[in-house]
């Protein structure tokens, strides 16, 4: 019989892609990437003094915040400005309507994080 899905080949391609990426990063590249994600997430957290952090402990590259207004409205406002601000936790059954999960990667610069923080501030107070 012919398979109805190509999930196995998709998994193999994803694994191959991950392997190539890790090889290109080199011996210390994964550690450097992880450190960059961590430090940039901590930097962004320090810029978000107008929201409540839902976890005061250390995080890696994601953290949850409670916004002063509903997350869906803030997300819509920021998407209109070209940002993908995060995931509303309520949609995942993990929080209230004002809770947002934000992720930061090594690809974002501090300048980009500053622009995002200011846009988020404006969206929260519109």
Regions found by a protein language model. Name each.
Residues 23-26, 38, 42, 49, ...:
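Hydrophobic alpha-helix feature that most strongly marks membrane-spanning transmembrane helices
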Residues 1-48, 53-56, 60:
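Active-site C-terminal subdomain of aminotransferase-like
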Residues 33, 44, 74-77, 112, ...:
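Hydrophobic side chains in well-ordered alpha-helices
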Residues 51-81:
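Conserved PLP-binding catalytic core of the aspartate aminotransferase-like
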Residues 27-31, 40-42, 62-63, 71-72, ...:
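Flexible loop/turn segments at secondary-structure boundaries
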Residues 91-126:
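PLP-dependent enzyme catalytic core of the Aspartate aminotransferase-like
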Residues 56-58, 81-101:
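Conserved PLP cofactor-binding pocket of PLP-dependent enzymes
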